[in-house]
Amino acid sequence: MTYTKDALKEAIQQKLRLNYGCTEKQATDGEIMKACALALRDIMAVRSVDTQERTQEQQEKRVHYMSLEFLMGRSLMKNAYNLGILPQLTQAVEDLGFSAPDIFDMEPDAGLGNGGLGRLAACYLDSMTTLDIPATGYSICYELRIFKQKIVDGQQVELPDDWLNLGDAWLMPKPQEAEEIHFGGRVRTRWDNGHLMVVHEDYTRVLAIPCDMLVAGYNTDHVNTLRLWDAKSPKPIDMQLFSQGQYLKANEERAMADSISTILYPEDNHYEGKSLRLKQQYFFVSATLQSITRQHIQTYGTLKNFHEKNVIQINDTHPALVIPELMRILIDDAGLSWDEAWDITRHSVAYTNHTVLAEALESWPQRLFETLLPRIWQIMQEIARRWQQKVDDFYHDPRKTEKMAVIWDGVVHMANLCIAGGMAVNGVSALHSDILRRDVFRDACGMEPDKFRNVTNGVDHRRWISQINPGLDGLIRDCIGDGYLTHAGHLSDLDRFADDAAVLSRLEQIKGDNKQAFARWAKRQQEVTLNTDAIFNVQVKRLHEYKRQLLNVLHIISLYQQLQDDPNMDFRPQTFLFGAKAAPGYAVAKRIIRLINSLADQINSDPICRDKLQVVFLENYRVSMAEMLMPASEVSQQISTAGKEASGTGNMKFMMNGALTLGTLDGANVEMHQVLGDENMFLFGLTADEAARLRQSYDPYLLYTRDPVLHRVLDQLKTGFRDGVSYEDLYQRLLYGADCPADQYLLLADFASYCAASHRVVDTYADREKWNRMSLHNIARSGIFSADRSIADYADTIWHVPYKK
């Protein structure tokens, strides 16, 4: 069916009347935005029903993608784009007397995530839909998305950020499909005719209400669903307590249930926080599996073929309880034997690992399981016992048994649970997967080598090129057509235009226009004036020490000191842009944010630096900001310590938009280097193997004493800047360590190499033809990092499902 401008206009008007009791003349911008969303939702709902009926009739295998994070960003433009009606929707809004850009800008980011993990899940859901794979995403319907970051006196302050006020138009609550989750209580068992009968009693009940968000694919009628679970108590308010004036007590159970879906990643440095996190994870897993198995039984009448018709992909270890919960359903509810249930489970679940950091491998105290999840704890103990026996029989080595244990010394290790109960374990870049095999999970890989795979991450190139960068999209279409939108590999055809002066000139003009557009946006949003004649040198990502925002800062300090020494030196203007949120409990990361703002205040107020050097911290970095920033960026800083970044996806988005990478051979940078070569990116620093060897005898203090530039830069941390704040704690952390080894992430070891590479960036930028050619090569060779390719890899090697080629 074709949707014209007039048809959409009429649909929006109807939604205003039926849902908000007003006409376009009375409607607010927010009501117009929600009416647009409802109109698009109706289109997708019809297609969703058709998709479900087709999947049911053909008995197709289904993919269930479980992730505690889904950073969907804004959906109005994205869904309109995928449905092929963005121009018509834009004109319909304008005809109703509203500014389409203003209406699109009204939509809050659906920030149901913290960073790359959630954005990856969103990209993958888009690609699964575009490739016609029957898939459902699952997560929690958080009331408050990731916090809103406010910078006050240079420091991060976290504010609650309610997205549902305007974002709920996309959600379709389905209370009739609610699931009941049980916490606490006690478990009784008895044998009856050779079968173990399990009785769970005296538990606390929580209802999981599904709220479905429809996802349209590009150039297809296929529509998939993101199912978000909202937690509610089934108990009404205690009227007796309420009538006695005990208002809080009367609402206690309701409040406890509501807290499960209030916020992503509650602080867990205390028992209550850990308890709430574990409740969140089990709530999410149990609701999802009950829903999946119920649907499967309705179709097939049995769970014995569950693994033949379903595959569950868990995005990191947060949904790892899917393994014992599926066992519980198969044994307790379906009456299968342990061996039958285990065979089904280990052929149903696949695990994606996203970290090599030991501290990030999730673990839980045993007592939490015993208290909150008594039946799951029983099943976990049996899984752990059988797995430990298998490891013992294979290795006969107590050290390996301990390292691979699911439960050891009162601690539950979730990654080991995923390995024990999963059919596949994949890393997210070639280097990362190699490190998992050789180091992190070496013993498990030695025992079950066929279980370990690699699927390099990818991003939704339609969103991150065509939708957000229409100028570049137009250039690509003029050069090679629009086939790249469904076959990203076609981007390689751009390479043949590398010596076309007109194409390179147009590419430079597009970048300049995007810089101007972002500067206007930054002025409106943050009242900052950017120097658009400067190189836009960008580092935006979650704030973590291994991502080394501090290394970037040290280099900027050295540039500032050079200008102080010689204000008249030849200095190509640079604007350094940072965007990062620190986890609320991560004190060191928060200190680095304050340091960036102290440095920015010093440099931006010093007349010596005017029109030469600028530092800006972009407040509240989010998906919609990235969509403005990435087309305008010229240098992409991907400078993590080699061997620490699993993959990264920001690096891919910058590459697709023609920014040149300044980076280490880490994560997906390695594969970028394979397609770009030394000549099209700026590499520096130690390799992962070199970093591992250096740590055995590393002394950062020696570097401090031998390098006068580094010495002076670090001393500046102690002195601080004009705001009077000293950063001696960071100085001490780098040189002597604190609760960690000195310079744990090798900033000082890579400092000189990083400065030299940064100098090469500036020198190369002066040769505009060369720079633009390098930029074109980056765009041309970025197709391998499309999420479509990633999903095809999963479909071929792990899920074994067909997809649209």
Predicted regions and their residues:
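A conserved ligand/cofactor-binding region detector
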Residues: M1-K805
